A protein has these predicted regions:
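Membrane-integral, polyisoprenol-dependent glycosyltransferases
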Residues: 1-264
Length: 264
């Protein structure tokens, strides 16, 4: 018996979810990359662009807290090396990060489901704030992207998807987040406080939650990797006793080298 084949039948790999994702990516790329150089360069962008240009041309990079972390400058310098320097290329790196920000809800698809993921992505796509900072050569969109990935890895560890591998990826996210912007300390404080409340260190809920072990490990990891960066605060205590452990602001010595009466 001859089987009649319907040529209009959808292939097995096609579904409406794939269709939506495809067009979501297309519209996101258009909204992030079209006419990137039409808007005048903002004051902050001019600083980031200039020092990135110096780095890309071999003049080196000197960190200045006024302009936040170094990651933005290194990414811009890499783009300048590959595509040349222009108003358009200055905004390529944040545009790429902004594209991924729109797609990040799909990382949580097993937790929140397909339709909520699509809805959140659409809101991120049309959000004026997210769109603006996705086309703005500053650190804001990078911190948003890495923060979402960090939270995603925390969730994966809580559900023990890949165990120690997730802790390693959390550490990588922390490394990046501290290279972007100072708000990273607030983000780590929020995650750390939440983890501490539900960890084994809290005597009120100890042994009452199945996730005590995971929350304890997350808190320990966040604390141990973040605490060394807070050591300059110790200068207020040690200076009271006449012990100078922290170099003054603007010191030009190499990191780790003594300066004046500084002990370390």
């Amino acid at each position: 018996m001859t089987e009649i084949v319907n040529i209009f039948k959808k292939p097995h790999y096609f579904n409406y979810f794939t269709f939506v994702i495809f067009f979501l990516i297309i519209f996101t790329l258009i909204s992030r990359f079209i006419f990137l150089d039409y808007r005048a360069i903002h004051h902050d962008e001019s600083l980031h662009g200039y020092y990135s240009w110096l780095l890309s041309n071999g003049f080196g990079y000197t960190h200045n807290p006024l302009m936040h972390g170094p990651l933005n400058f290194h990414l811009n310098a890499l783009v300048f090396l590959i595509f040349g320097d222009s108003d358009y290329t200055l905004r390529i790196a944040p545009a790429v990060a902004g594209t991924f920000v729109v797609l990040t809800p799909f990382l949580f698809i097993k937790i929140i489901g397909r339709y909520p993921s699509i809805l959140i992505s659409v809101f991120l796509l049309i959000s004026p704030i997210i769109t603006y900072f996705s086309r703005f050569a500053r650190n804001d969109i990078f911190i948003a992207l890495v923060s979402i990935i960090l939270i995603y890895q925390v969730f994966r560890y809580l559900y023990m998807v890949e165990g120690k591998k997730n802790l390693f990826l959390i550490s990588i996210c922390l490394g990046f987040i501290f290279c972007i912007k100072e708000i990273s300390f607030i983000i780590i404080f929020i995650l750390g406080s939440f983890s501490l409340i539900f960890s084994s260190f809290n005597p009120f809920i100890k042994h009452k939650l199945n996730l005590n072990y995971q929350f304890t490990n997350i808190f320990a990891l966040l604390f141990l990797l973040s605490f060394p960066l807070s050591m300059p605060i110790s200068s207020y205590v040690f200076n009271f006793f006449g012990i100078n452990l922290v170099a003054p602001s603007g010191a030009l010595n190499k990191i780790g080298m003594p300066i004046g009466n500084v002990a370390i």
